């Protein structure tokens, strides 16, 4: 964004930077201006925020300007929810209260504690914990089918990207992958006695193949120890590297999942700049055509300010590349530093999206306020779909 600052409109922030004091009795600071491009809101051309906690001044390019007291005006005249206290699009929006249907009891239960202890003892990472999934209690306790499930996260617990909805910790230089992780993960999962498992990972832009080789080793190790197990892989976009997609698709997995996350218009706001709508569609399309019978899956968060027409456009684009499974869930803000919730979508609206999705050709749609990418991924319908697709592919070949 800094490289693009010569284009207009733009805004500048005056940031206090500590300066070496001339005496021990006083504190000095100087101000440095950072110019950033205003992509979505051309009317927002300049912000001078010398005291971000107290007030800011907006100049709309005319001779007059407006001074806003953020302490008394949480939203301010900003074209995004949450005001300007924590930066663009962030901070708590006090006008939005979490509805009852999103309130969850704290995870508890004997089975939950057993799974938690097992994961800790085996030194495994789970997206359930790292991403603060609201369904962790239901899934680890067995849910409706009585089978405790967890989504295992490989390639470490530190992501190289900084998507503005995600609670997973980030770093430009995370630790190198554990070479024993594929085997240890396979041994642990084989001991659980489950017949469907979801493997996901952080983004690893620091690795030449984006981590696809390590991911594939994990799948092959699981299939070798337990051939009948069904494996779903929820992957990164591998920076759009289709050879990396091939590596994983041909590792023996049964479901290839990659999330577009949100509608096209909101991509640059919600996701890391290295991700993109067209890039994600390309990855999903290639996974489908790369191997006969491959089931593809994606997920969209609602409540970020998308419109119905934009959601339908995304669904149409996904059906055009023959995505089989789609999930919808409510975006929940993990911390005040993350994106604010624009809207709490009602359960009735989620039911509408499920019905609409199935009417336009998706083979399975999971849609609900607390649904997440891997929510009840291995339920009977999906497992039956995997078996049928495998038989069809074998018959064709």
From Swiss-Prot:
Which residues does the record give as [4Fe-4S] cluster 2 binding sites?
A: 159, 163, 166
Gene Ontology cellular-component terms for this entry are: chloroplast; mitochondrion
Q: Output the InterPro entries linked to this UniProt entry.
A: Aldolase_TIM (IPR013785), Elp3/MiaA/NifB-like_rSAM (IPR006638), LIAS_N (IPR031691), Lipoyl_synth (IPR003698), Lipoyl_synth_chlpt (IPR027526), rSAM (IPR007197)
Q: Where in the cell is it found?
A: Plastid, Chloroplast
Q: Which SMART domains match?
A: Elp3
The molecular function terms in GO held by this entry are: 4 iron, 4 sulfur cluster binding; lipoate synthase activity; metal ion binding
Annotated pathway: Protein modification; protein lipoylation via endogenous pathway; protein N(6)-(lipoyl)lysine from octanoyl-[acyl-carrier-protein]: step 2/2
Its recorded reaction(s) are:
[[Fe-S] cluster scaffold protein carrying a second [4Fe-4S](2+) cluster] + N(6)-octanoyl-L-lysyl-[protein] + 2 oxidized [2Fe-2S]-[ferredoxin] + 2 S-adenosyl-L-methionine + 4 H(+) = [[Fe-S] cluster scaffold protein] + N(6)-[(R)-dihydrolipoyl]-L-lysyl-[protein] + 4 Fe(3+) + 2 hydrogen sulfide + 2 5'-deoxyadenosine + 2 L-methionine + 2 reduced [2Fe-2S]-[ferredoxin]
Q: Which UniProt keywords apply?
A: 4Fe-4S, Chloroplast, Iron, Iron-sulfur, Metal-binding, Plastid, S-adenosyl-L-methionine, Transferase, Transit peptide
Cofactor(s) this protein requires: [4Fe-4S] cluster
Q: Which intervals of the chain are annotated as region Disordered?
A: 49-85
Q: Which family does it belong to?
A: Belongs to the radical SAM superfamily. Lipoyl synthase family.
Name under which the protein is recorded: Lipoyl synthase 2, chloroplastic
């Amino acid at each position: 964004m800094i490289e693009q600052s010569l284009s207009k409109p733009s805004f500048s922030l005056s940031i206090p930077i500590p300066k070496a004091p001339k005496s021990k009795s006083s504190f000095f600071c100087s101000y440095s201006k950072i110019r950033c491009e205003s992509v979505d809101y051309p009317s927002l051309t300049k912000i001078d925020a010398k005291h971000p906690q107290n007030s800011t001044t907006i100049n709309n390019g005319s001779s007059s300007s407006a001074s806003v007291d953020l302490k008394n005006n949480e939203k301010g005249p900003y074209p995004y929810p949450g005001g300007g206290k924590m930066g663009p699009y962030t901070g708590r929006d006090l006008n939005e209260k979490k509805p009852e249907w999103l309130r969850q009891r704290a995870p508890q239960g004997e089975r939950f504690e057993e799974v938690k202890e097992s994961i800790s003892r085996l030194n495994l990472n789970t997206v359930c914990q790292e991403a603060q999934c609201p369904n962790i209690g239901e899934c680890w306790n067995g849910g409706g089918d009585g089978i405790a499930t967890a989504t295992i996260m490989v390639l470490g617990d530190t992501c190289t990207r900084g998507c503005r909805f995600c609670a997973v910790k980030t770093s430009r230089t995370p630790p190198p992958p554990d070479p024993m992780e594929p085997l240890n993960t396979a041994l642990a999962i084989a001991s659980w006695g489950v017949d469907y498992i979801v493997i996901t990972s952080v983004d690893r832009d620091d690795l030449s193949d984006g981590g696809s080789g390590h991911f594939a080793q994990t799948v092959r190790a699981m299939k070798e120890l337990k051939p009948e197990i069904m494996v779903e892989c929820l992957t990164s976009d591998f920076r759009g590297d289709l050879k990396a997609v091939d590596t994983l698709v041909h590792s023996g997995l049964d479901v290839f999942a990659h999330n577009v996350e949100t509608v096209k218009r909101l991509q640059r706001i919600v996701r890391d700049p290295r991700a993109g709508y067209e890039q994600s569609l390309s990855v999903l399309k290639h996974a489908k055509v790369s191997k006969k019978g491959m089931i593809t899956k994606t997920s969209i968060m609602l409540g970020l300010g998308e419109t119905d027409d934009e959601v339908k456009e995304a669904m149409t684009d996904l059906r055009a590349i023959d995505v089989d499974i789609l999930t919808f869930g409510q975006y929940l803000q993990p911390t005040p530093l993350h994106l604010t919730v624009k809207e709490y979508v009602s359960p009735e609206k989620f039911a509408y999206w499920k019905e609409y999705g199935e009417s336009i050709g998706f083979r399975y749609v999971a849609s609900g306020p607390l649904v997440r990418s891997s929510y009840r991924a291995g339920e009977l319908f999906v497992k039956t779909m995997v078996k049928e697709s495998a038989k069809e592919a074998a018959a064709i070949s």
